[in-house]
């Protein structure tokens, strides 16, 4: 029983132990599982973070855009860090010491300032003489733009007599190929030499001038420079004789002037469109300067106020500026030429000014001149002046390395030397013909040692400065065989490559220069032709406008003058008195004389009478050719003012057409209180074959006299004429020629003499007044029918004979030509009408006047 109980207790204890063990195992498993889960989470988090960092690092590394594995990313990162460490070490080694460099200046800025202070510039030259970099400080020193020298041979800018020496210096490392290692290139290779360099000019045809300069530099090793073409000299020196690093060496030098310049042009313009405003008096003294001027010119406003602007201008620009200022004073506004302004730092800066004159608002007097000055670069100035000279200048060449720079506008000359060398490492190498063609122009000099610092030579071929597009294309076509042939023909040895180069290039430039000069002359002639044609069109337009204005003024004067003459005729009609006219006969004789008379710019000339008729007639000659052609209008504009028995001494001028009328000159023949005598000698033949002439003269007392012949002259005294003014029109274009001629021919059986005198009897004036009334009626009819006026005396008939004294003055309202026959036929019809009228009057005995 006891055994049974104990056995039961033992079994219960064993079961209890097994359960506890199982529970313990379960608890341990749960703990391990929790630990694994926690560990897995932490591992996953770490891996995720590592992947994110690798991905971010891969995105920052340069290279392909493809996905890289972790090891590649880490490897490139290590390489980048190593390279960065090396560059940092080199920068620290080349860093300028802070004890003599200001902290606010970068290395590039400090280097530029030092070059300007030392009158020097940087120059990087390959061993074959090709220039790969030049700093901008060359512009104020030698007046070259950096683009003029980049990618050209240095031998183009050095006298020919110094080529061999410079070539030996640049190729000196070839002779030391054993000792010249990359380590040597980094340390003990400093080189100094002196030579002459060509100065730049605006006109390439000017006489070349050379400046004496000093080169101080050393050879630099370029790691990734592609193999050079050596400008066509591969056949001269075998490739196997050259060291492997020859093509990767360039000569970097600082070029300084032997004679320093105290005043230089500002070489760099940070912002070419910078401008400032100033105000000047009429004497060109500063009155105002705005706040933008001090950073540009260096002067504060109080430093320039009251001083003349001419104190700051370059002496070579004074003449052009004076002409511009004269233009300003004449037109009130304008634009100046390019000129140099002296800054406070003793540098010349190029400016262009727009100015205008301001006037007082009350009295309109000029007060002062407002100027807006704009900063311009030397490249713009040179391009503009070369265009004025008819020289085509191509734009600065953009190298291939710049085209690879996306969005960059900086040229190779605006970067540092280090960047230029790096760009040259990746830039494509020009072909042999292209590289050789750029060394095309050379100028022969007599003796480079004639002057120590500056040398002027007289040559027929101008030096090479810049190449236009068509020149470079023509020169690139030159082959290497032509270069070697020309070098042999000129006697240059093959062992000296660069000595054969100038001769080759001189021939090439001689061939391309006539084409360039011809194109430049053709462009200049075309430009001049366009300017002349434009100026001609402007002058013609002004002439047409002035002619139109003159025509309108003449029409107005004609209208006013016609109205005044009508009133004058009405007033003078009441004062006319007529006397009797007696015709007497005399012996016949021939009087033939031509007497020219000058009468206020007009010529009055007597002509011979035809068929024995004594006639005095002053009229416009229809044999003179006039310039304009309107004969019909002229014939219808003629008008005869006829008197009854005596001469009516007044002239009416009126035109019904709208043609251009000339200005009139008035000739006044005054009548004294005594009787005015008009003598008409008449010597008429008995037969039809003899002719007689009436000679008309004017005396100083303004009397009209006909010179006496050998026969009897009878005198008749007529009543005084109230109006003694004879108005003779004259044209403003040409002097009017008036000739006396007979209107019609009639045979005279008896000589006749007409004399007009003045009567004083008051009783006869009443009868003459009645005659005036009857005589004016046909005259008024003729006046309304014919606008052009003639002054004629009355014709008196005695039996079947007739005599006439006609004084006519033609009004040249239109310059025209007309035939004599048509004019005489028109006058003959008028004379016949007058004959009928006078015959009726003479038959009336109450109208007769006793002698």
Curated annotation (Swiss-Prot):
UniProt superkingdom: Eukaryota
Residues the record annotates as the site (Interaction with E-box DNA) are 39, 43, 47
**Where does the motif Nuclear localization signal lie?**
32-47
Q: Which Pfam families match?
A: HLH, PAS, PAS_11
Task: Give an example GO biological process.
Answer: protein acetylation
* Record's comment on post-translational modification: Ubiquitinated, leading to its proteasomal degradation.
Report the SMART domains cross-referenced here. Answer: HLH, PAC, PAS
Enumerate the PROSITE patterns for this protein.
BHLH, PAS
* Gene Ontology CC terms, in alphabetical order: CLOCK-BMAL transcription complex; cytosol; nucleus
Main localization is cytoplasm
Q: What does this protein do?
A: Transcriptional activator which forms a core component of the circadian clock. The circadian clock, an internal time-keeping system, regulates various physiological processes through the generation of approximately 24 hour circadian rhythms in gene expression, which are translated into rhythms in metabolism and behavior. It is derived from the Latin roots 'circa' (about) and 'diem' (day) and acts as an important regulator of a wide array of physiological functions including metabolism, sleep, body temperature, blood pressure, endocrine, immune, cardiovascular, and renal function.
Q: How does it assemble?
A: Component of the circadian clock oscillator which includes the CRY proteins, CLOCK or NPAS2, BMAL1 or BMAL2, CSNK1D and/or CSNK1E, TIMELESS and the PER proteins. Forms a heterodimer with BMAL1. The CLOCK-BMAL1 heterodimer is required for E-box-dependent transactivation, for CLOCK nuclear translocation and degradation, and for phosphorylation of both CLOCK and BMAL1. Interaction with PER and CRY proteins requires translocation to the nucleus. Interaction of the CLOCK-BMAL1 heterodimer with PER or CRY inhibits transcription activation.
What is the name of this protein?
Answer: Circadian locomoter output cycles protein kaput
- In which organism is this protein found? Tyto alba
Name of the coding gene: CLOCK
């Amino acid at each position: 029983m006891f055994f049974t109980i104990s056995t039961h207790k033992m079994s219960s204890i064993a079961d209890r132990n097994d359960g506890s063990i199982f529970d313990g195992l379960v608890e341990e498993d749960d703990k391990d599982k929790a630990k694994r889960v926690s560990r897995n989470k932490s591992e996953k988090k770490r891996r995720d973070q590592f992947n994110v960092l690798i991905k971010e690092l891969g995105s920052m590394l340069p290279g392909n855009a493809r996905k890289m594995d972790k090891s590649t990313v880490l490897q490139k990162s290590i390489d980048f860090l190593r390279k960065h460490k090396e560059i940092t070490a080199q920068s620290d080694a080349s860093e300028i010491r802070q004890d003599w460099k200001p902290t606010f200046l970068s290395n590039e800025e400090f280097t530029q300032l030092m070059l300007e202070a030392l009158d020097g510039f940087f120059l990087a030259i390959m061993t074959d003489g090709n220039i790969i970099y030049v700093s901008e400080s060359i512009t104020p020193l030698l007046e070259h733009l950096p683009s003029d020298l980049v990618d050209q041979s240095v031998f183009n800018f050095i006298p020919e007599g110094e080529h061999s020496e410079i070539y030996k210096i640049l190729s000196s490392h070839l002779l030391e190929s054993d000792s010249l290692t990359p380590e040597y290139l980094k340390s003990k290779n400093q080189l100094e030499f002196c030579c002459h360099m060509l100065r730049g000019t605006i006109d390439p045809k000017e006489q070349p001038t050379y400046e004496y300069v000093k080169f101080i530099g050393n050879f630099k090793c370029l790691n990734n420079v592609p193999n050079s073409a050596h400008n066509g000299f591969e056949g001269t020196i075998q490739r196997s004789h050259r060291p492997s690093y020859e093509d990767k060496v360039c000569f970097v030098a600082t070029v300084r002037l032997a004679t320093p310049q105290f005043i230089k042009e500002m070489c760099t313009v940070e912002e070419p469109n910078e401008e400032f405003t100033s105000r000047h008096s009429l004497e060109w003294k500063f009155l105002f300067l705005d706040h933008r001027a001090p950073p540009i010119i260096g002067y504060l406003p109080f430093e320039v106020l009251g001083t003349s602007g001419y104190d700051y201008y370059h002496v070579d620009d004074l003449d052009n500026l004076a002409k511009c200022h004269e233009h300003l004073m004449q037109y009130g506004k304008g634009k100046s030429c390019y000129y140099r302004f002296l800054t406070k730092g003793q540098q010349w800066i190029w400016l262009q000014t727009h100015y205008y004159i301001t006037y007082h608002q009350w009295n309109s007097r000029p007060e002062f001149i407002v100027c807006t000055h704009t900063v311009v670069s030397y490249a713009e100035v040179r391009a503009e002046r070369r265009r004025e000279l008819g020289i085509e200048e191509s734009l600065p060449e953009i190298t291939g390395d710049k085209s690879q720079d996306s969005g960059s506008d900086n040229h190779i000359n605006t970067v540092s030397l280090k960047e230029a060398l790096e760009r040259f490492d990746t830039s494509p190498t020009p072909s042999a013909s292209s590289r050789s063609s750029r060394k095309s122009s050379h100028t022969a000099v007599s003796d480079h040692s004639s002057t120590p610092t500056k040398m002027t030579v007289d040559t027929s071929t101008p030096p090479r400065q810049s190449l236009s597009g068509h020149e470079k294309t023509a020169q690139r076509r030159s082959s290497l065989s032509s270069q070697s042939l020309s070098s042999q023909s000129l006697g240059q040895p093959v062992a000296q490559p660069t000595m054969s180069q100038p001769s080759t290039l001189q021939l090439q430039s001689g061939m391309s220069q006539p084409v360039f000069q011809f194109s430049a002359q053709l462009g200049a002639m075309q430009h001049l032709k366009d300017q002349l044609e434009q100026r001609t069109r402007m002058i013609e337009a002004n002439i047409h406008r002035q002619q139109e204005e003159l025509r309108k003024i003449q029409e107005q004067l004609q209208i006013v003058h016609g109205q005044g003459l009508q009133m004058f005729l009405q007033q003078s009609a009441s004062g006319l008195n007529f006397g009797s006219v007696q015709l007497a006969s005399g012996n016949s004789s021939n009087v033939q004389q031509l007497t020219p008379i000058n009468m206020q710019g007009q010529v009055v000339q007597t002509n011979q009478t035809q068929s024995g008729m004594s006639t005095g007639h002053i009229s416009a000659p229809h044999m003179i050719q006039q310039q304009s052609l309107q004969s019909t209008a002229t014939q219808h504009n003629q008008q005869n003012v006829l008197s009854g028995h005596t001469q009516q001494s007044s002239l009416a001028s009126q035109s019904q057409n709208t043609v251009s009328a000339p200005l009139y000159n008035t000739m006044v023949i005054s009548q004294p209180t005594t009787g005015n005598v008009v003598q008409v000698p008449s010597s008429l033949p008995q037969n039809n074959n003899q002719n007689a002439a009436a000679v008309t003269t004017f005396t100083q007392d303004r009397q009209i006299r006909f010179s006496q012949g050998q026969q009897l002259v009878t005198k008749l005294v007529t009543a005084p004429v109230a109006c003694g003014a004879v108005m003779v029109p004259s044209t403003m274009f040409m002097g009017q020629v008036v000739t006396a001629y007979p209107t019609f021919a009639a045979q005279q059986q008896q000589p006749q003499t007409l004399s007009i005198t003045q009567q004083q009897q008051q009783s006869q004036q009443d009868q003459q007044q009645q005659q005036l009334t009857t005589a004016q009626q046909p005259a008024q009819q003729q006046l309304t029918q014919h606008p052009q006026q003639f002054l004629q005396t009355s014709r008196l008939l005695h039996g079947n004979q007739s005599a006439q004294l006609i004084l006519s003055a033609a009004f040249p309202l239109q310059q025209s030509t007309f035939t004599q026959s048509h004019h005489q036929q028109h006058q003959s019809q008028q004379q016949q009408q007058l004959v009928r009228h006078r015959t009726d009057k003479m038959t009336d005995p109450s109208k007769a006047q006793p002698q």
